[in-house]
Amino acid sequence: MSRSLKKGPYIDFRLDNKVQALNDSAKKTVIKTWSRRSMISPEFVGHTFAVHNGNKFIPVYVTENMVGHKFGEFSPTRTFKGHAAKGKK
């Protein structure tokens, strides 16, 4: 189910505060986050986030096409090793 429109998007307040501080100081540093459920807002465009996938941090550079999506969509948690070759059953 999607989130109700009357509630608005969820953005972690700590993450929002960090981006606001970086925008004010005009610095470009990597922002570490564990908040995979946070929605990407237009203020995040141009910043690099290190999104935790449960094991390590995956760097994600935010572009305009990513606005409205969530951080978890860009850091996969599972690795696909491939199916067994034919005859290897």
Swiss-Prot record:
Gene Ontology BP, a term: translation
A GO term, aspect molecular function: structural constituent of ribosome
Keywords, alphabetical: Ribonucleoprotein, Ribosomal protein, RNA-binding, rRNA-binding
UniProt key word Transferase: no
SUPFAM superfamilies recorded: Ribosomal protein S19 (SSF54570)
Taxonomy, superkingdom: Bacteria
Family: Belongs to the universal ribosomal protein uS19 family.
Main function: Protein S19 forms a complex with S13 that binds strongly to the 16S ribosomal RNA.
Protein name per the record: Small ribosomal subunit protein uS19
Species: Cytophaga hutchinsonii (strain ATCC 33406 / DSM 1761 / CIP 103989 / NBRC 15051 / NCIMB 9469 / D465)
Gene: rpsS
